[in-house]
Amino acid sequence: MTRAIMETDKGTIHLELFDQDAPNTVKNFVDLAGKGFYDGLAFHRVIPNFMIQGGCPNTRPGEQGMPGTGGPGYKIKCEINPNKHESGTLSMAHAGRDTGGSQFFICHSPQPHLDGVHTVFGKTADMDVVNAIRQNDRILSVKIEA
């Protein structure tokens, strides 16, 4: 199982990535992390008791676009799988089926209405850090461990 270490303003989030259940989504996340794509981006959407969302390049200092509307310049297909949106679930954000790219979210609590809609591709147990993150806190780096 591939693991990612996400350093944030509020601490470290260790992520287990679901290579078997969402191989293309995991590969995309790993590739973007390897290029430093996520480094310095903000969590642009934080809804208490729901989720934190990041991965929009428009949150990089000096960018002009509206936060929450950016991506890597391409879209990936959804990989809906049996994993549920529970506390600590890492899932792909999108603006409609097969429109994801770089934005992701981590759930604060179970969100069953998202099951079968968004691609679950990982999980964290570091809920103290997830719960401490506020809007505009930053991702410092994402490192991948095979």
Q: Where are the language model's segments positioned?
A:
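Cyclophilin-like peptidyl-prolyl cis-trans isomerases
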Residues: 1-146
